[in-house]
């Protein structure tokens, strides 16, 4: 994960649109004194520890819930897409950040604005990527069961 000062070179329209908003916020800060914080989420994952909030999709596409459904017998065998990525184990790598950490980051961003005028952007990730196979191995270790895939 690059730090906030790392060059920003979006590779797709989605990324370009996010960078465009950051530039608009910077322009609004310079022109009108509008203070802002843009939070750059990486891959949000998880649920509240008390289970009050979390993901619930009729058609689940996220890796971690599908791995857990598969290992716990609540769904079909996991389908792993791609095994030829230029990564150590050939599977895709993602930097996951827990939803409760994201919620805390929002509160910290509001506090930050109290003493830091202008437009700011912060990366919200854990700083380390995890491959699909690493996620599968972690689920197996936590549950004590092999993930069918």
Locations of the language-model features?
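Amphipathic alpha-helical interaction segments
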Residues: 22, 49-50, 114, 138
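C-terminal substrate-binding subdomain of Rossmann-fold SDR/epimerase-dehydratase oxidoreductases
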Residues: 64-149
């Amino acid at each position: 994960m690059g730090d906030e000062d790392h060059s920003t070179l979006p590779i797709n329209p989605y990324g370009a649109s996010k960078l465009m908003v950051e530039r608009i916020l910077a322009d609004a800060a310079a022109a009108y004194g509008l203070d802002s914080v843009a939070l750059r989420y990486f891959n949000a994952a998880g649920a509240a520890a008390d289970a009050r909030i979390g993901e619930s999709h009729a058609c689940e596409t996220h890796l971690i819930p599908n791995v857990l459904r598969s290992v716990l017998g609540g769904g079909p065998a996991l389908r792993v897409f791609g095994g030829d990525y230029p990564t150590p184990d050939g599977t895709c790598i993602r930097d996951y950040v827990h939803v409760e950490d994201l919620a805390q980051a929002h509160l910290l961003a509001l506090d930050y604005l109290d003493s830091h005028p202008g437009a700011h952007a912060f990366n919200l990730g854990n700083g380390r990527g995890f491959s699909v196979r690493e996620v599968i191995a972690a689920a197996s270790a936590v549950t004590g069961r092999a993930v069918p895939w």
